[in-house]
Amino acid sequence: MSSPKLTVAVLFGGASTEHDVSQLSVTSVLRELDRDKYELLPVGITRSGEWFLYTGELSLITDGRWEQSDARIPCLLSPVPAHHGLMVQKADGWQPLRVDLVFPVLHGMNGEDGTLQGLLELARLPYVGCGVTGSANCMDKDIAKRLFTAAGIPTARGFTVYRGEVPSPAELAAKVEAELGWPVFVKPVNLGSSVGVSRACDAEELAAAMEEALRYDCKVLVEEAITGAEVECAVIDRKSVV
């Protein structure tokens, strides 16, 4: 006798500047997950934070057309453990929809920064990915660098600039020349997918890069450029075995 399917809520979109990236990612995830093993519940979150259970074609997700589709049902993630999943709006009111596992395919703030993970912990729902502490620490590049440094792990040389405490363009350029050298990369601290990131080779480009990064965040990281290969490593924790 075959095992019952696990019901998996797959979250995508999100109130984030990386909303579009999430829609691309989730399309691949939904195509690859084995539907013989899992009952998939795609849950789209709009930029304004509205949640919908989406039952339409996957092709409409990639470019955001799912938001104009009739195949959307308003829903929300219930923080009440007894509900163990979603609340879905029906003709006769809101009804619980049980979920076995939540798979967030969200990028950036409100998805990878520990906020969603906190909600899932309150709801006592199992989920894919890092916990609250790991998510929050890793989303903030400044805090992550401090933790790596404390652990003796080398990182690129750099410094953090806060909105409201930004030096004059001349002072900032002088600091770069004294501490890092050109070129440098300027990054919003709490974003991913290279949103708001610029490469600066002189004072004029540095000023423009700071202005761009501060559009997205109140804290900006300026780092030396390093030439090398980028290596990605996936880590899976199974019953305390990494």
Q: What residues fall within each predicted segment?
A:
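ATP-binding N-terminal substructure of ATP-dependent carboxylate-amine bond-forming enzymes
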Residues: M1-V128, V132-T133, N137-I143, L147-A150, ...
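Structured helix-beta-strand junction loops
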Residues: D36, A123, E179-L180, Y216
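Glycine-rich beta-alpha junction loops
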Residues: T46-G49, E165, V189-G192, I226-A229, ...
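ATP-grasp fold ATP-binding core
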Residues: F148-T149, V176-V197, C218-V231
